C-alpha cells in the first residue's frame, strides 16, 4: 500500500512541475527503480537512483527511494545518511523521520533513533506512525507501560492509522484487561482490510480472549 501511495505522490509531484523531457525521464527511472526493489534487485535499483541524483541532486523522491534501497539491502548507515539529508526538505513528512529512525536503530544507534522520533513528533505531532515507533522501542526495552501510553497516543491523534490499534490490542491481549483487548481488537478489525497477517493475529487474540473469559477459573 505504501508503494502505491508513493507512486501516486511521484506522479502528482511531476504533474505540477514544468513538463520537460528530463522530468519525464526522471519519473520513469524512479518508478523503474521501485519496481526493481519490489523484485529484490537492490543493486540495479541503487544504480538507477544514483544516476537520477547525478543530474538532479535535490530530487526528494529519488533520494528517498535510494535511502530505502540501501535499507532493504542492509546498508543501514548509507540509508540513514540519505534520510538525514531529507528531513530538512520541504517535502519531508513523518515517514521520512520514521525511516531515518529505523535506519539508525538497525545500525545500532538507538539513542539517535529515539531523538529522531521525538524530533519528528515535534514537527508532526499527529503522526500515529512516530508514536507507534516510540512505543515499540519502549516495548523492546521492557517498558510496557510507556509502550502502551505511546500506542494509545497514536490511536488518539491518528484514529485512521491502524497499526496504533493493532499494537494496543496485541499488548492488551497479554494483560489483565481482556475487555479492553477485545475493544481495541474489534476496532482494528473494523478498520484494517489489507494486512492479512495482522488480521489473523488479532482474530486469534480475540478468540483466545473470549475462551479465557468463558473458561472456569
What role is predicted for each listed range?
Residues 55, 89-90, 123-124, 157, ...:
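Structural marker of alpha-solenoid helical repeat scaffolds
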Residues 51-52, 85-86, 119-120, 153-154, ...:
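Canonical positions in the second alpha-helix
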Residues 25-27, 60-61, 93-95, 128-129, ...:
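Helix-start (N-cap) detector for alpha-helical repeat units in TPR-like alpha-solenoids
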